[in-house]
């Protein structure tokens, strides 16, 4: 973009001529890219299993052949040449969202979730889907199929040190969490990227997409759309809804960016459009479940969804670490919708710990929704760190943490213990840190509860009085004809090879490329063009902001009316949020038994238990866990064969048990440490030196942590002894 001068330059005739020639050439080249896009769209949609994976894949399990068939499939990603896969590392399974687009975005390029996992030495699998649903398939059927897929992956990797790490992007995130709630034993760490789980949450004045369901009267329109599709919901409507959130980009910026950089931008543009235009379909019943139970009903975090056999889906059942990746720049899944389910389920961090849950979150400052799982920069930073440090995340003590990434610089201590360009540390957080991102107050929740009631009423009215007529009138050929006329499909087809008006474009574009004469960057008319483009964007942005403001205002006025809330039976006297999860009395009883068992076992064990307990006691004073400390533990295991006897799962269980002992009765847990130690002072000294080596890997201990280390030294009976150092950093990786 040329620099603007405070005094406009008057264009000469030469400026006008060169600009006009360039603009004409750009227009033809732009049309040629549109032609290529149309041809690519037709070729892509004609495939049996279209996807945008940048990797070769082998079919492992076809969901259409299961007892309850679905259009999903499990494939193995074939590692590219030169990639080294470690059979002992846990496999990664990437689940792509079925939100209107086709599968493959998680492996769209080398710098992707799949790419960084392969780079870190993990075997990779991908769960994708076909464009057409199996007749009658439901969300529950898909959940059951994904359980079978994970069982298959586990069986294929018997030597792996842990269960698969599962990544759920966008709408696949809630699907993964539902399955993990029902079958927690199938999961290693879970990474959910840009995934909404608390659907009413948000900040006033921002993220207005959550109001759309209420302003449309609820989910009756979803039912109507499915009926007009003869039982099929067209995913193109979901894509259009996404585009409507950013009219400036949809109507102008995306196309203008191509036009203004047509000599260099075509490849990137076509690569993205290949995925963006690959619209898929859902059964109407699937979409109705998603809208009623999740986006309008907000029942997932509240534990109000049940399977067909009566099992309640409770996310507190999940025992694997949950990594939540979201962004303040994401207007589709803002931080509140990605994180407030934690507040819906738990009243405190102690309650998170009591359920044995480990939750790690990281919030990007500005990346948009698609960038969370498409951006190469995000893949090289956040996803690369998650993949490289997945074992560290897996063994974190229960609690709430924020993953903080710090660049490796010259001032960083022990950089040889860092695997990449960033240091990841997990810092302890409280629920107030989640609340600080903003969210609903009680009045907001009541408004959304009222909107959910109105949705139920309108849906019942539609099903009673209109649905029989619509279903009787719409035939499958009529539905297919309406789908083919969808504006998002027409914008591809009108420029495609089927349009005879476009026949001359390819040849003309070839001639222009041979005689290309781009305009000079300092041409004043080019500066005027850029200025006009900014004005168009500003105008569309102003329109968006006005519509969003009015939408929020009307939603608050309509559903905040006391008379309407009273008529709908909304309780305005209680202080309890309408969708807060109920407490489980059985869990309290089990917890009491567990506490008693922990107290009884405090003096049982040996040097392992003593070291783990001491490590946690000192580390808790720091309030964070650093990847350098975990790497030091790994090197100690390599240096001392006897330490290798513990698998990662056993090490995780050891750390959790010792952590809970400290939580239950810290004084008694510390007092029992001497009973766990060997009698020989040399062995105690070597063990303490190893402990100090791990604790000081991120840097010297200070303050309370240093005082605690001295207390541990006394417990080891070494107050007058100088520990023998273990030079673990000299051990080869």
From Swiss-Prot:
The lineage of its organism: Bacteria, Pseudomonadati, Pseudomonadota, Alphaproteobacteria, Hyphomicrobiales. The keyword Membrane applies. GO terms for cellular component: membrane. The keyword Transmembrane applies. It is found in: Membrane. This is Uncharacterized protein in ackA 5'region. The chain crosses the membrane at residues 174-194. Keywords: Membrane, Transmembrane, Transmembrane helix. Its main location: membrane. It comes from the Bacteria.
